[in-house]
């Protein structure tokens, strides 16, 4: 009985230690360019649904010549699986590769996720109020 209690205690301690090391990427992220908010606004929201399952949503905007009032946008929304520090988003022909660090997302390989000149590519920083 003592051996079982010790084994269960060790399992609980190792589980708690693992949980403390796995980062939580949930939050609101905004795209930055040269340490400033990007003039072509883009944001991504991650909501944790399970241990490695997130709901991902976001919007990216491209503003053309102000005299012509051209504005194009793209939207993303779906359930994604975190694999290591990467999310591969693929919904309705829109694909993204997202690499996650503690407070940043790096989006690349944007394909088909918005109107003309719209892209989600770039570096996103988690806003402090969403941590």
Regions found by a protein language model. Give the residues of each.
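Edge beta-strand at a domain terminus
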Residues: 69-86, 110-131
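Short, hydrophobic/aromatic-rich segments at coil-to-beta transitions
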Residues: 22-32, 52-55, 81-89, 106
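Positively charged n-region of N-terminal signal peptides that target proteins for export
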Residues: 1-4
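N-terminal glycine/threonine-rich, aromatic-flanked beta-hairpin/loop signature
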Residues: 38-79, 109
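Acidic, glycine-rich flexible loop segments
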Residues: 86-102
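Generic beta-strand structural signal
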Residues: 48-49, 82, 100-101, 126
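Tryptophan-anchored aromatic micro-motifs
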Residues: 21-42, 120-128
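N-terminal signal peptide c-region/cleavage motif recognized by signal peptidases
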Residues: 14-16
